[in-house]
Amino acid sequence: MSLATLETRLDHRFGNAALLEQALTHRSHSARHNERLEFLGDSVLNFVVAAMLFERFPKLDEGDLSRLRANLVKQASLADIGQRLELSQYLRLGEGELKSGGFRRPSILADAVEAIFGAAFLDGGFDTARKVIVRQYQPVLASVDPKTLGKDAKTLLQEFLQGRKLALPLYTVVATHGAAHSQQFEVECAIPALEIKVVAPGASRRAAEQSAAKLALEAAQAASPARAVRKQGKARKAAQLSLPVAVAQEVK
């Protein structure tokens, strides 16, 4: 498959296309794989993301900046970038990895993303690698909230519900798919008090729970204003109903 579309998404045309091919090559495919490029890309990525955070959040201290960076460069965040780049269709995997669904495995996607950053550094130097990384991370940073740094979706949902004195969510595995070594899980997250039930998939039970919690949190945040309006309406109605009784008591 042509790499031209991927290069457009990266906003970099490789002078040495072999570097990009190597970045997409898993060790199960050939001896010239991407692990050394991944090592290099990891170092460049950490520096560039640290600089981006330093500029964007001038009031955050070192501890908060470190936690935020760790959250942005972790495997799940890199795998999300890999999915957005549609790397699955470009990965070069051995037969065993192909059969086991390695092209969608978060660890393989994340490693390939870091390897691409390393390849960009070797192909065009630091400025090129920085441009490639910034392009991928700008939309991520635009939605970053320092108040939630380092907290996963389940923790955020729990804090949201506890802050409103609501019962904690219930997580249930509703389905599993695939062979034992490459199972996909579907988990339901239910919040009875808000009449919310959502289902999300994941490569592990934990990943599916996190995805379901994220959907449930979004639904709960959307439902909260409407719930508050309903409560105000009920309180107003109760006050109106009690008014004639109060008047009657005064007349007596």
UniProtKB/Swiss-Prot annotation:
Catalytic reaction(s) noted: Endonucleolytic cleavage to 5'-phosphomonoester
Annotated residues for binding of Mg(2+): E38, D111, E114
Source organism superkingdom: Bacteria
Keywords: Cytoplasm, Endonuclease, Hydrolase, Magnesium, Metal-binding, mRNA processing, Nuclease, RNA-binding, rRNA processing, rRNA-binding, tRNA processing
Main location as per UniProt: cytoplasm
Domain called DRBM: residue spans: 152-222
Cofactor requirements of the protein: Mg(2+)
GO molecular function: double-stranded RNA binding; metal ion binding; ribonuclease III activity; rRNA binding
A single GO BP: rRNA processing
Active-site residues from the entry: D42, E114
Domain RNase III, chain residue ranges per copy: 3-125
E.C. designation(s): 3.1.26.3
InterPro entries on file: dsRBD_dom, RNase_III, RNase_III_dom, RNase_III_sf
One term under GO cellular component: cytoplasm
Subcellular location: Cytoplasm
Class of the enzyme per the UniProt entry, highest EC level: hydrolase
Keyword presence, Ligase: no
Description of how the protein assembles with itself and partners: Homodimer.
PANTHER family with a match to the protein in the record: RIBONUCLEASE 3, RIBONUCLEASE III
Entry's family note: Belongs to the ribonuclease III family.
Protein function: Digests double-stranded RNA. Involved in the processing of primary rRNA transcript to yield the immediate precursors to the large and small rRNAs (23S and 16S). Processes some mRNAs, and tRNAs when they are encoded in the rRNA operon. Processes pre-crRNA and tracrRNA of type II CRISPR loci if present in the organism.
Listed name of the protein: Ribonuclease 3
Organism: Bordetella petrii (strain ATCC BAA-461 / DSM 12804 / CCUG 43448)
